[in-house]
Amino acid sequence: MSWFEQRAGLDGTVAVVTGGAGGLGAAIVEDLAANGVRPAVIDLDDAAVKELRDVLDKQGVDHIVTQGDARDPDALTALFEQVDERWGRVDTLVNIVGGTFRAQFVDTGAKGWDAILRTNLSHVLHACSLAVPRMQAGGRGGSIINLTTIEAHRAAPGFAVYSAAKAAVEQFARTLSIEVAPDGIRVNNVAPDYVPTPKLASLGGGDSSLSTPEGVRVAIPMGRAGHVTDVSNSVVFLASKLSSFITGTTLHPDGGTFASSGWFNWPDSGWANHVPSRILANATLADATEA
């Protein structure tokens, strides 16, 4: 057994993961499983669920992967009941489910607000209400990890309610972490920034300069886009005993953008937190002309 395996203490533990079948979620589940964790996953995407099942089956992982809506309290309850029957313990909860749409606040209404809050905040409350009593009853402590976003920590024009919901998750986690600390349960957040995934691409809107190396170098101090493993590594760390004295905080696997955050209202293209491609192209052309 390696030093990490000895210190991490993940082998044989059980993790409930909401939204764990695609993109970031699948990377997190697969990395947890690689460290001996038995995952119980709920995800709305039926194709992604089937794909994740196949991957875990081929790896010989003991798992529960079910198609369902984590925003539905009954579906969440059913998943936890399956975990009770199968393994009789919950050691880790990872809340990944999230989503939004881009629109100015004045162009949205109560139906849109409710959908965003239900997706990004309410399901976290339901999942925690199911996980915490089980962790307390188990007497082994536990770790709750919420996937939030850099937008919980800065202005996000076009995403007012989404950023507010994610900020609410952050504050909920801080408060819950204090309430459950005497039980040895830790609560933390992981707030990534730009990690290219199909879901991120589907949001659209604004300029696309972050798809170019030049744009990434301008926007991200470390000079590259994030990888799903940058996020999954953070989750594995927070699930493990290597972080046993860390609670009520947020990890930022973002290449430094939280430290350097700034939104700019570029002429003709509106709000963006990066330099538009047309400006980069003009600058490159000017440099070439001068040369």
Predicted regions and their residues:
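Active-site helix of classical SDR
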Residues: 128, 165, 173
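Short-chain dehydrogenase/reductase
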Residues: 244-258
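Canonical Rossmann dinucleotide-binding motif of NAD(H)/NADP(H)-dependent dehydrogenases/reductases
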Residues: 3, 7-40
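Residue(s) in the substrate-gating loop at a strand-loop-helix junction
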Residues: 149
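Substrate-binding pocket helix/loop in short-chain dehydrogenase/reductase
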Residues: 104-105, 109-117, 216
